[in-house]
């Protein structure tokens, strides 16, 4: 039994509130246990300079954390005048993941801006951001289809992400909270499509190693967790996302 009484293969309580903020084309609040992230998707009718003239779109992401999203106050990165390496890594991960399931040629020369703002952190903020951002992006594209700006959604598959890890006693677990993450011997983030294909796997031994068997067990746990997340996404987007 884990520190929050969950089973090793049990997700935290999940809630995704759609249309959380009124201004963006797509907006959700995703809650995974005590981790809470606002994910907004905004459509801009232009692309970055390196994409101009190609007739295709782009998806990019920004990620930030409120100063008191954590137990101790963090200084805003805007006050520091630069984005940390961790933040840059997470932003690129979110953007890469979302682009993997979208036909950018169908968007035309438009940019989808994804803004993920962590308002409360208890582990798994980057994976929650990807899962929530997919829903926000889907809602944004649905609005373009409703307005007849796009003929159909450019989304080709569902997308979700989850963390898995190995505790110091050798137990593989799903969806780590902050306490588990800070004490884990191995930490891994997995991004997968609704069809069960891997998009990204980030795994690190925290002053430890892991066996091929443990790797397979973690991948299996992650796949099972992501299937549950995709099921929730499908229920939310039943009348918004029609994938050919």
UniProtKB/Swiss-Prot annotation:
Annotated protein name in UniProt: Ribonuclease PH
Enzymatic reactions: tRNA(n+1) + phosphate = tRNA(n) + a ribonucleoside 5'-diphosphate
HAMAP family: RNase_PH
Free-text function comment from the UniProt entry: Phosphorolytic 3'-5' exoribonuclease that plays an important role in tRNA 3'-end maturation. Removes nucleotide residues following the 3'-CCA terminus of tRNAs; can also add nucleotides to the ends of RNA molecules by using nucleoside diphosphates as substrates, but this may not be physiologically important. Probably plays a role in initiation of 16S rRNA degradation (leading to ribosome degradation) during starvation.
NCBIfam families, alphabetized: RNasePH (TIGR01966)
Organism (species): Oceanobacillus iheyensis (strain DSM 14371 / CIP 107618 / JCM 11309 / KCTC 3954 / HTE831)
Alphabetical keyword list: Nucleotidyltransferase, RNA-binding, rRNA processing, Transferase, tRNA processing, tRNA-binding
Similarity annotation: Belongs to the RNase PH family.
